[in-house]
């Protein structure tokens, strides 16, 4: 009984995080389009913008790699039971 509450809470948190990530992805795609437009208009400023975006993508990749060993087994165990 207690385990089902934990899995339900985890599922709710996961759904909320997926929704917020989707909203953030929509906003970041708009920001990316603006950054590309700025890069085309001003190559010097654009190079700096693209460099910063590359750093942000590397950080996001590291976060995803760190979370995967924790999140994936939880999802698999929740789906299997």
UniProtKB/Swiss-Prot annotation:
Function: Cationic amphipathic alpha-helical peptide with antimicrobial activities against E.coli (MIC=3.1), and S.aureus (MIC=3.1 uM). Also shows histamine-releasing activity (33.6% at 10 uM). Does not have activity against S.cerevisiae. Does not show hemolytic activity, even at 50 uM.
GO biological process terms, semicolon-separated: defense response to bacterium
Alphabetized UniProt keyword annotations: Amidation, Antibiotic, Antimicrobial, Secreted, Signal, Toxin
Domain of life where this protein originates: Eukaryota
Signal sequence, renumbered to the chain: 1-21
Residues excised as propeptide: 22-43
Pfam families: Pilosulin (PF17499)
This protein's name: U-poneritoxin(01)-Om6a
Tissue expression per record: Expressed by the venom gland.
Gene Ontology MF term list: toxin activity
Cellular component GO terms held in the UniProt record: extracellular region
InterPro entries: Pilosulin (IPR049518)
Positions where Alanine amide occurs in the chain: 79
PTM info: Truncated sequences of this peptide have also been found in the venom. It is possible they have been cleaved in the venom.
Subcellular location: Secreted
Family label: Belongs to the formicidae venom precursor-01 superfamily.
């Amino acid at each position: 009984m207690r385990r089902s509450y934990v899995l339900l809470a985890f599922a709710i948190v996961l759904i909320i995080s997926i929704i917020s990530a989707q909203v953030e992805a929509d906003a970041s795609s708009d920001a990316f389009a603006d950054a590309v437009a700025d890069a085309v208009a001003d190559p010097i400023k654009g190079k700096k913008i693209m460099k910063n975006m590359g750093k942000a993508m590397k950080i996001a990749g590291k976060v995803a790699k760190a979370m995967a060993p924790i999140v994936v087994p939880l999802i698999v165990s929740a789906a299997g039971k």
